[in-house]
Amino acid sequence: MAASTMSVCSSAYSDSWQVDDCPESCCEPPCSAPSCCAPAPSLSLVCTPVSCVSSPCCQAACEPSACQSGCTSSCTPSCCQQSSCQPACCTSSPCQQACCVPVCCKTVCCKPVCCVPVCCGAASSCCRQSSCQPACCASSSCQPACCVPVCCKPVCCVSTCSEDSSSCCQQSSCQPACCTSSSYQQACCVPVCCKTVYCKPICCVPVCSRASSSRCQQPSCQPACCTTSCCRPSSSVSLLCHPVCRSTCCVPVSSCCAPTSSCQSSCCRPASCVSLLCRPASSRLACYSLCSGKKSSC
């Protein structure tokens, strides 16, 4: 006769425990309600009820697969609580409820991989306890109106500004990447991320309000910032024959950018042939600086 081992399982219809002799070929159906089976590996040597492996709410083996379609409304809220899941659990788990951190992502292994809470429209305090990494900011499912994820502040996940708010964005301390790719730029305020040391040398020009008379007067960026609508090249058909500045060296007007900028020699193009008073006499072209008001040579 084949050797046997002991397996223990619980029954939904009885509080008693059943002890069965299990053959080597494991396993006979030991319970009337397979989904309630709880394997007891400490009491069973080689026999684990097969039905428990496929159980959607098997508490002792709550892996990412158990957190998916099997985790229905009938599944208890404690499902997935003991999971030490991989990052995939954090993004694809349907256990994400309306106003809470996905339970499977509460473990240490998942927090650093962007387990962002799902915001609900009615709760104003949701998402405030997130401690995820910067990677969460780009793909965050948090709605801007709901809250500002705490973990994302250093990487430019700035809350949406209201039109009547003058102090919005004041707490941002983001990296230079936020200045160019931020989808938050609105007319209500200057993104504070462009005032930090990281952003100043990388041309983070603040977004100005249309009604503001001091448009772009405060940036402290590099000359490359001035290649915008603030710059006005001179006319090529002027009788005084001002050289036309190329876009790479656009001279700013007095109301914008840095008033001390001057036209470099590489800006100058040959004078227009339409001009009656200007005809280049040599290879050294006349260059008139719009910023300083003085002639120079290219």
Swiss-Prot record:
Q: Which UniProt keywords apply?
A: Keratin, Repeat
Mark the sequence repeats by their residue spans.
26-30, 36-40, 57-61, 79-83, 89-93, 99-103, 104-108, 109-113, 114-118, 119-123, 126-130, 136-140, 146-150, 151-155, 156-160, 168-172, 178-182, 188-192, 193-197, 203-207, 225-229, 230-234, 249-253, 256-260, 267-271
Look up keyword Repeat and say if it applies.
yes
Spell out the GO cellular component terms annotated for this protein, sorted alphabetically and separated by semicolons. Answer: cytosol; keratin filament
Q: Which superkingdom does the taxonomy of this entry point to?
A: Eukaryota
**Tissue specificity statement from the Swiss-Prot or TrEMBL entry:** Restricted to a narrow region of the hair fiber cuticle, lying approximately 20 cell layers above the apex of the dermal papilla of the hair root; not detected in any other tissues.
Tell me the Pfam families matching this sequence. Keratin_B2_2
Annotated region (25 X 5 AA repeats of C-C-X(3)) at 26-271
Q: What does this gene product do?
A: In the hair cortex, hair keratin intermediate filaments are embedded in an interfilamentous matrix, consisting of hair keratin-associated proteins (KRTAP), which are essential for the formation of a rigid and resistant hair shaft through their extensive disulfide bond cross-linking with abundant cysteine residues of hair keratins. The matrix proteins include the high-sulfur and high-glycine-tyrosine keratins.
Fill in the subunit field for this protein.
Interacts with hair keratins.
Give the similarity note: Belongs to the KRTAP type 10 family.
Protein name as it appears in the record: Keratin-associated protein 10-11
